Amino acid sequence: MATTQQSGFAPAASPLASTIVQTPDDAIVAGFTSIPSQGDNMPAYHARPKQSDGPLPVVIVVQEIFGVHEHIRDICRRLALEGYLAIAPELYFREGDPNDFADIPTLLSGLVAKVPDSQVLADLDHVASWASRNGGDVHRLMITGFCWGGRITWLYAAHNPQLKAAVAWYGKLTGDKSLNSPKQPVDIATDLNAPILGLYGGQDNSIPQESVETMRQALRAANAKAEIIVYPDAGHAFNADYRPSYHAASAEDGWQRMLEWFKQYGGKKSL
């Protein structure tokens, strides 16, 4: 059996499940690139359809705590098959490598907690700029993120006024603040620039339903264009097909809802 690193997954993500989805890449172009950002060159993975008739709608894909490992790369490939230019930047690259951490608690304390939200949001702006220079339609800019990236997706929806749509998968909504994370999504409910869909698991021990309801109340009070779907039988990381937490029915429904959300709000094609 291949180890997590041999198979393209972060070591802290083990044990791997037998439900891993691998998207065929014969109809897409995919690979690694480097994106100039804040004086550095940020590694990123991107995928796009081989055939297109002009600039492509753009989806920024924000990683889980495990970085841009094989699951996130496959998410990009799936989006490319749907006609998007999908880009997943390595948002921890200045602070360290997720592959150097063997377990989740050490990864969180030794790497993830060291990454400032402000740095991440600025990096994502540079990803959008790179996309506009590399076949992407900046007027159809969208974002989705998972776990750690789900929280970042909420924050980015309040950060970039050019964003057209956002979908956050089981991202933290409330909780403690720090110098690197001065705000939680509940704090920016009044500042959202784009319609946002949240996808959550009813059995998620890390994001209690009280937290979800608090966010819903904040969104209603702000009259925000937002919706939160809770899948009663799903836990955290229910879309992570490489983990035991995978809940296929919820993941498949969430994926279709995401595509519909992007189609509804993603903006019109540039002339």
Swiss-Prot record:
EC number: 3.1.1.45
Keyword Hydrolase: yes
Signal peptide location: none
Known catalytic reactions: 2-(5-oxo-2,5-dihydrofuran-2-ylidene)acetate + H2O = 4-oxohex-2-enedioate + H(+)
InterPro entries on file: AB_hydrolase_fold (IPR029058), Dienelactn_hydro (IPR002925), Dienelactone_hydrolase-like (IPR051049)
GO molecular function, one term: carboxymethylenebutenolidase activity
Pfam families, A to Z: DLH
Alphabetical keyword list: Hydrolase
Regions that span the bilayer: none
Family: Belongs to the dienelactone hydrolase family.
Protein's recorded name: Putative carboxymethylenebutenolidase
The organism of origin for this protein: Escherichia coli (strain K12)
Lineage start: Bacteria, Pseudomonadati, Pseudomonadota, Gammaproteobacteria, Enterobacterales
The gene coding this protein: ysgA
